[in-house]
Amino acid sequence: NRRNCGSELITNRKKYCSFSCIYCECGWNKIDTSIQVPLNKREDIKKALYKKLSESTKEFNTTIDSITFSGNGEPTLHPDILGIVEDVIELRNQYCPQAKITILSNSTNLVREDVFKALQLIDNPILKIDAGTERMYKLINEPVSCKFEQIKQKLIEFGSKCIVQTLLLRGECKGERIDNTSEEEFTAWLEIVKQISPKSVMLYSIDRETPEKNLEKLLIPELEQYAERVRALGIETNTY
């Protein structure tokens, strides 16, 4: 789920992701991520960001407070993600040192050494984990390949620098009951969060149209009930 984070640097309307989440506003996956597809080149991204930052700060006197990697899919699928992150940090330091760099990631590529390193360099690595068990992970996220245990262990290894992002929902998909708010599921998820000990947690629910129609949106008062259980662990938690 990608919420609006400001003006877009490079527009790409095609979804390219290692998940096919039942709640994703971008719809079901239509591109096979196991094959090579044309992506924006590192040097083109750097040029576009240079143009944007130099124009915004010099000509329009705009204060930039955030640079965000998001888009319609998983940004860490880019083979040059480490170099791109290093370029962004270089330009940020030059033109808007006050700005925080954020990435929204589904955590699947933390198994790649270059991705793990790249995300460690970022101010706000927002890393997703929507389930407490392998079964619910497969039902909600419909992953291409990455195993739940791999994601869990890499998030624990990543530790307190990350911000954990989780979408809570209930519903039905393909005849299966979906519910990551049940006592069993939420307790399992909570134990993982405890082991990660993140900087903070973001709990949110469905905001836009979803590809699977039989899903229930949780309202803020209910999200707050779950947030209180996370706060009881001493972890800052926000609801959206």
Listing of model-derived features with the role each one plays in the protein:
Residues 1-27, 66-69:
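N-terminal pre-triad scaffold of radical SAM enzymes
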Residues 12-16, 31, 134, 171:
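Short, acidic Gly/Pro/Ser/Thr-rich loop/turn segments
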Residues 49-52, 88, 158, 226, ...:
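Hydrophobic alpha-helical packing residues
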Residues 219-240:
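Binuclear metal-ion centers of metallo-dependent hydrolases, dominated by the metallo-beta-lactamase
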Residues 42, 85, 186, 219, ...:
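Amphipathic alpha-helical segments in well-structured domains
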Residues 77-204, 209-216:
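Conserved AdoMet/S-adenosylmethionine-binding subsite of the radical SAM
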